[in-house]
Amino acid sequence: MILLGVNIDHIATLRQARGERYPDPVDAAFAAERAGADSITVHLREDRRHIQDRDVVLLQQTCQTKINLEMAASEPMLTLAERWKPQDCCLVPEKRHELTTEGGLDVVGNRHRLADAVARLHDAGIRVSLFVDPDLEQISAAGAIGATVVEMHTGRYANAATQAQRNLELEQLYRAAHQASLNGLTVHAGHGLTYHNVQPIARLPDLKELNIGHAIIARAVMVGMESAVKEMKRLMREAVKTP
């Protein structure tokens, strides 16, 4: 069964919009876990636009599943991860003015810096994933520098303007998943996935986990967090059963 990591960043976005103490990401994590979430993902950005340091600490203390901490491979972030020791860290590219992560890491062009970051996190007992575009060269480089997991960026698939373009992007994701498996990497995927487009991705070969945030939080506004998570889990189960 494919695992579901629920990204709760936008619970914090709503809180920070008014500078209030609510809604609390910890409450959202509890609800997601009750509904079957297999992990909780948070992106601690360097500008602290949504998730705060306190949130990560409290989630570490209270989550019943595991924490997947998304972060830039910067010295301040690495130092925090070494202190907090979340079960998983996903290294992502970060631009201060972007609304959301716009693409995957350039592992090929930043091989030495990322290799050092991966080694430091491994030494702290943290499983490390790299957020990469479904590019065969980038995936091979991720394996070469010691990453355990690649999370494939599904944004181009999600944002494809036509079905033909979406099919092309899906084919590339299939090739990339196969390449990752050949390199001994665990395959995760995420970004831009919704209730309408998740099922083809859930059928990717060797896929172990999906990380989904915005769509689930948006749905939760209408039906509640537990119902939103259960609905996504159902779609994932059905996708795996249907060839």
Swiss-Prot record:
Single GO molecular function: pyridoxine 5'-phosphate synthase activity
GO cellular component, one term: cytosol
Transmembrane segment boundaries: none
Main localization, broad class: cytoplasm
Domain of life: Bacteria
Reactions it catalyzes: 3-amino-2-oxopropyl phosphate + 1-deoxy-D-xylulose 5-phosphate = pyridoxine 5'-phosphate + phosphate + 2 H2O + H(+)
Catalytic residues of the enzyme: 43, 70, 191
Pathway as given in its UniProt record: Cofactor biosynthesis; pyridoxine 5'-phosphate biosynthesis; pyridoxine 5'-phosphate from D-erythrose 4-phosphate: step 5/5
Signal peptide: none
UniProt keyword list: Cytoplasm, Pyridoxine biosynthesis, Transferase
InterPro entries hit by this protein: Aldolase_TIM, PyrdxlP_synth_PdxJ, Pyridoxine-5'_phos_synth
Binding site for 1-deoxy-D-xylulose 5-phosphate: 9-10, 45, 50, 100
Binding site for 3-amino-2-oxopropyl phosphate: 7, 18, 192, 213-214
Site (Transition state stabilizer): 151
Single biological process term from Gene Ontology: pyridoxine biosynthetic process
Keyword check for Transferase: yes
Subcellular location: Cytoplasm
EC number(s) stated in the UniProt entry for this protein: 2.6.99.2
Subunit structure, as described in the record: Homooctamer; tetramer of dimers.
Task performed by this protein: Catalyzes the complicated ring closure reaction between the two acyclic compounds 1-deoxy-D-xylulose-5-phosphate (DXP) and 3-amino-2-oxopropyl phosphate (1-amino-acetone-3-phosphate or AAP) to form pyridoxine 5'-phosphate (PNP) and inorganic phosphate.
Similarity comment text for this entry: Belongs to the PNP synthase family.
Protein name: Pyridoxine 5'-phosphate synthase
Organism taxonomic ancestry: Bacteria, Pseudomonadati, Pseudomonadota, Alphaproteobacteria, Magnetococcales
